[in-house]
Amino acid sequence: IMVRGRAKAFLAGPPLLKAATGEIATDEELGGAEMHCSISGVAEYLAEDDADGIRIARDILARLPWNDRLPMRAVKTWKEPRYPVEQLAGVVPTDFRQPYDMRELLARLIDDSDFLEFKPLYGSSTVCGHGAIEGHPCGFIGNNGPIDPQGATKATQFIQLCCQSGTPIVYLQNTTCLLYTSDAADDMQC
């Protein structure tokens, strides 16, 4: 969790960069929270302030098991999704080549439509996060159209996290094509 405008992570700060290369850059450009959450993928969550960071941390910890030998237990009572499951037919297009927003589908499947998205600003073509179905905690992985390298990296990291915590994974496939490089994206007809 990195706090916008406050958290930074880099190997060499602006003075060293300027001395070594002549390039002028700010702390934020080199290693600010927003950059690490959206471009490098180093950080998973971007908080607006310290209180928001604590809220995010509490939400994450509430979804992870406290014992690595036992899986999360299902809760006995749960809330239905906030959006009717009957609306799924309107969310998923009949043309399988047409992408749709996986979050709309998840909102109709997950208990109380309560989804904690993993790295929401990074690899935006892939949606990963924590939720529950009928009280059973699950990890969810889906994609909004073609899978790009950042999305594949994010999915890999999320799969590792779920495996380490013993969390089952639900895969929701919405791949219209696969992008290997940015040059390949220009050549493909999706």
Question: Where are the language model's segments positioned?
Answer:
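Short, glycine-/Ser/Thr-/acidic-enriched flexible segments
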Residues: A7-K8, L16, A51-D52, I133-C138, ...
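Conserved structured catalytic cores and adjacent interaction surfaces
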Residues: P168-Q173, L178
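Conserved small/polar residues in nucleotide/adenosyl-binding loops
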Residues: Y180-A185
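Terminal amphipathic helices with adjacent charged low-complexity linkers/tails
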Residues: A51-P99
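Long, structured protein-protein interaction/assembly regions in large complexes
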Residues: E117-P137, I141-S165
